[in-house]
């Protein structure tokens, strides 16, 4: 049954924090507060945003987004989702949830602004391999991700170009550099960018895995990113997310103009695998358009090429 898009007046949401109602958090976690929805200002810009999103939501109703997974895998995902303590996260997969909204934060239309509401976004990044089983109109998909997008945006705001091949999460850790250690550095950096109160710390078991104290890790991060040190500790995260939401809107509408559906997962996009190369081109162009500097991408292949061990270049060449 084809859905009717949500009315435009419900698509742009502005939230703020109720500072009198802090949420309970574990020690050394970022402080959180109850969120309240406030009135979205009626301006030409918010009307434009709503019109653009309504157009995307109307387009997505013409397509079928599904999971090509056995029931046992769906049960595993459902159990993981049911245990999520965040009340703003889905507790189960509802395949009818394909209508998106843009949510802004801190009562400011220039902070945050990412797209939410699609069921595919509820698949935790730790379970990313399940997203390789998402299909669009029965076709296999791939996911193209911006690499270290928020850090690259901060550098761009300072007018500094970064080599697309440079790993911004490599901070010179002692010992062998591994994917698991890189993920912890990424978690730390992304957290401090959204932690104005400077209360965040990785858990003790995570710090032991890195072989560092919180202070030693922070010192390495700030030394590695000395040109943007002040921005990192000032909690610039919501500002960078607004810029990446502008980039996302541009990508979504560009692909709609081409008759191609992309599914946003904040700073990555899912598309039919035959459109991978086109999406990569559009993503790099949009990043340059909004930042003035080159971006960097990472692509997750569909499950079949992964199974046969194809390299990304080999897989791309299958379509040439």
PLM features: residue spans?
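Non-catalytic nucleic-acid-binding interfaces of large nucleic-acid enzymes and RNP effectors
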Residues: 1-130, 139, 296-320
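Helical catalytic core of nucleic-acid polymerases
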Residues: 117-235
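Catalytic palm active-site di-aspartate
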Residues: 145-146, 189, 261-272
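A short acidic (Asp/Glu
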Residues: 150-156, 273-282
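A generic structural motif
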Residues: 165-176, 266, 293-304
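C-terminal polymerase-core module
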Residues: 196-201, 276-320
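Adenine-nucleotide phosphate-binding core of ATP-dependent small-molecule kinases
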Residues: 230-247
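Active-site palm subdomain of RNA-directed nucleic acid polymerases
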Residues: 246-265
């Amino acid at each position: 049954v084809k859905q009717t898009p949500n009315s435009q007046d419900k698509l742009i949401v502005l939230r703020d924090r109720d500072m009198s109602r802090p949420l309970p958090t574990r020690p050394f976690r970022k402080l959180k507060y109850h969120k309240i929805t406030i009135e979205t200002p009626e301006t030409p810009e918010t009307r434009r945003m709503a019109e653009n999103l309504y157009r995307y939501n109307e387009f997505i109703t013409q397509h079928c987004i599904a999971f090509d997974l056995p029931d046992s895998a769906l049960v595993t995902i459902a159990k993981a989702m049911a245990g999520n303590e965040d009340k703003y996260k889905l507790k189960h997969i509802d395949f009818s949830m394909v209508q998106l909204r843009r949510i802004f934060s801190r009562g400011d239309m220039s902070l945050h602004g990412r797209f939410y509401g699609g069921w595919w976004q509820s698949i935790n990044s730790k379970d990313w391999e399940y997203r390789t089983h998402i299909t669009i109109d029965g076709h296999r998909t791939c996911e193209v991700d911006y690499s270290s997008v928020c850090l690259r945006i901060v550098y761009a705001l300072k007018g500094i170009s970064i080599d697309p091949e440079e790993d911004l999460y490599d901070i010179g850790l002692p010992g062998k550099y591994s994917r698991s250690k890189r993920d912890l550095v990424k978690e730390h950096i992304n957290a401090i960018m959204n932690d104005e109160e400077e209360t965040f710390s990785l858990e003790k078991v995570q710090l032991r895995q890195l072989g560092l104290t919180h202070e030693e890790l922070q010192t390495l991060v700030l030394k590695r990113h000395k040109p943007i040190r002040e921005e990192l500790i000032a909690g610039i995260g919501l500002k960078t997310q607004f810029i990446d939401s502008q980039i996302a809107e541009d990508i979504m509408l560009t692909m709609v103009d081409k008759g191609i559906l992309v599914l946003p997962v904040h700073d990555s996009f899912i598309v039919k695998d035959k459109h991978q190369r086109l999406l990569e081109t559009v993503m790099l162009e949009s990043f340059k358009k909004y930042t003035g500097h080159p971006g960097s991408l990472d692509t997750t292949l569909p499950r079949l090429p992964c199974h046969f061990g194809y390299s990304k270049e080999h897989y791309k060449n299958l379509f040439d």
